[in-house]
A protein has these predicted regions:
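C-terminal amphipathic alpha-helical "assembly" element
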Residues: 197, 204-205, 215-221
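Beta-propeller domain segments
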Residues: 7-13, 20-31, 43-44, 49-180, ...
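Small/polar loops that bind or transfer phosphate-bearing groups
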Residues: 40, 207
Length: 221
């Protein structure tokens, strides 16, 4: 079983001693209770899903850090390597150093893996589902669906929608496409905030909205 645990802070500002065993995905043996870190340096990994292909790889959607401006840092979706390190808190999106973090750790930065796919800054990309739903039209035939909870500190706002990232084979192959939007009114006030996403057994896409207290089901008319 894979278990995602987010950080206790934005960039370690509460003390790195308070981040022990956090900002990582654990691999847990349910029968014995034994566990070990599977992937580390992930500020807030939320959604997880296995990608397509004969040897499925685990992917996650990661909610990255704030307070570096409206256009940094992009949230992202990435495949995971066993024992891979993805930078947090010392660097972001690979080896871009966050100078706010003390003490620095150049050795950790040097081994930080750049993620596979940027999902935009402050989108709060949380939910993740990967598959080929039969109930959606051809443009959404195979790829990843991401629930974007939406920004709280960006102008203009970002996120507040569900996007689709097409895959070719086992890899992302194009720009994100909106699947479900309209969660902001004309004055920029939220009337819904997508979180979890899942593919149901009848070919539809389920979207949990924790502001509207609603689960939406999306499929072709």
């Amino acid at each position: 079983m894979f278990v995602a645990i987010g950080s206790n802070s934005d960039h370690g500002e509460r003390g790195l001693e308070n981040e022990t065993d956090r900002a990582r995905i654990w691999l847990v043996d349910i029968a014995s209770g034994r566990h070990r870190p599977y992937a580390t340096g992930l500020r807030n990994p939320v959604g997880m899903a296995f990608g397509p292909g004969p040897a499925p790889v685990l992917w996650t959607a990661v909610n990255e850090r704030d307070e570096l401006g409206s256009d940094l840092v992009p949230d992202y979706m990435t495949s995971l390597r066993d024992d891979g390190f993805y930078g947090w808190p010392w660097s972001y999106y690979g080896q871009h150093i966050d100078t706010r973090v003390a003490p620095p750790n150049p050795e950790a930065v040097a081994r930080a893996i750049a993620p596979d796919y940027a999902l935009g800054p402050h989108t709060a990309s949380l939910g993740l589902a990967i598959g080929a739903p039969s109930g959606l039209p051809a443009p959404f035939a195979a790829g990843a669906f991401i629930g974007q909870h939406g920004s709280w500190n960006r102008r203009p706002p970002s996120g507040y929608k569900v996007v689709f990232v097409p895959f070719a084979g086992t890899r992302p192959s194009g720009p994100p496409q909106d699947v479900l939007s309209g969660f902001l009114d004309e004055e920029g006030r939220a009337r819904g905030r997508p979180v979890g996403v899942a593919l149901d057994g009848r070919g539809g896409l389920l979207v949990a909205d924790d502001l509207g207290d609603t689960v939406w089901r999306v499929r072709s008319a």
